[in-house]
Amino acid sequence: MGSISNNSGSEDCESREWLPSGESPAISSAMFSAGVLGNLIALALLARRWRGDAGRRAGRGNSISLFHVLVTELVFTDLLGTCLISPVVLASYARNQTLMALEPERRACTYFAFAMTFFSLATMLMLFAMALERYLSIGRPYFYQRHVTRRGGLAVLPTIYTVSLLFCSLPLLGYGQYVQYCPGTWCFIRHGRTAYLQLYATLLLLLIVAVLACNFSVILNLIRMHRRSGRSRCGPSLGSCRDGSGTRRRGERVSVAEETDHLILLAIMTITFAICSLPFTIFAYMNETSSRREKWDLQALRFLSINSIIDPWVFAIFRPPVLRLMRSVLCCRVSLRAQDATQTSCSIQSNASRLTFVDTS
């Protein structure tokens, strides 16, 4: 996927059978290697966490976090997409043929375009499911405890795959069309001929907005939980703080910390996908008669593909110790302000309690 001649017209790109001279598979090979390695590392870390969580929680009867079930499904989706898409591009470079010429009747081109649209949509739907799970866990805890289960989380993956399959099969039924783009190593939805490309891009945008809205709501609820935990420190100072109330406060602080870690991880993945999807969205809404170049089309596809490479590395890099450090940095200013407010509030309540005690005595 090297440099592309700007003199090549769209019709030539759609019908060419041989790759232009000077094309190199270096970038595609690097992306494939990084994607496979990152996803395998992430799956190994998730498997280790699953075993550790199962061992620690066996005595308490708690199931493994539903959030990590969804993360595992996301990493599995990214790995599956990388392994099913990248080898087609590498085969094209190895034979010096375009996707149109790899298989008769454009089968390789159709397969590549369908797989790209399918896994991109499935990834965004997985991120939306993760954001919705966090929103229900924090914002609607009663509904979450009664209706959201680990078994339901296991059903998310086949449901998302079914929805993505139905939506991405529309070009195979005549609504939209897959075509080859320069330099001949990738195919996607035809630009400017039907509304399907704009519909696909709009769906991705709506999902991104929904994920951001869920994350924003979770942030507001976490701030409220943090303030409540700060105010609870001003509770009765006699025997009540030595029994169950202290345990409840510790549990609430642990809950806030765990939810904050999940939110940081989800926010990074969401921002990454939004950045990677932006060039594709611009590509989808640009007019066919604009001054766009084939190289811009290729860069938009690369950005869309990079997301499945970055996601597992985000999970592998942002381990619990790193998340705790980030949480401490992000919450430092809030904690200092809350501490001052709490000390002031506690002093007022303490003085009021003393005055009440003097009056009653």
From Swiss-Prot:
Spans traversing the lipid bilayer: 24-47, 66-91, 112-132, 152-176, 199-223, 263-286, 300-323
Residues in compartment: Extracellular: 1-23, 92-111, 177-198, 287-299
Record GO biological process: adenylate cyclase-activating G protein-coupled receptor signaling pathway; negative regulation of apoptotic process; negative regulation of intrinsic apoptotic signaling pathway in response to osmotic stress
Positions annotated as glycosylated: 6, 96, 287
Gene Ontology MF terms: prostaglandin E receptor activity
Pfam families: 7tm_1
Stretches for region Disordered: 1-21, 230-253
Record topology, Cytoplasmic segments: 48-65, 133-151, 224-262, 324-361
Compartments (UniProt record): Cell membrane
Disulfide bond positions: 109-187
Topology within the bilayer: Multi-pass membrane protein
UniProt KW keywords: Cell membrane, Disulfide bond, G-protein coupled receptor, Glycoprotein, Membrane, Receptor, Transducer, Transmembrane, Transmembrane helix
Bias (Polar residues): 1-10
Annotated Gene Ontology cellular component terms: plasma membrane
PANTHER family for this protein: G-PROTEIN COUPLED RECEPTOR FAMILY 1 MEMBER, PROSTAGLANDIN E2 RECEPTOR EP2 SUBTYPE
Family per similarity comment: Belongs to the G-protein coupled receptor 1 family.
Purpose: Receptor for prostaglandin E2 (PGE2). The activity of this receptor is mediated by G(s) proteins that stimulate adenylate cyclase. The subsequent raise in intracellular cAMP is responsible for the relaxing effect of this receptor on smooth muscle.
Name used for this protein in its record: Prostaglandin E2 receptor EP2 subtype
Native species: Canis lupus familiaris (Dog)
Lineage of the species this protein comes from: Eukaryota, Metazoa, Chordata, Craniata, Vertebrata
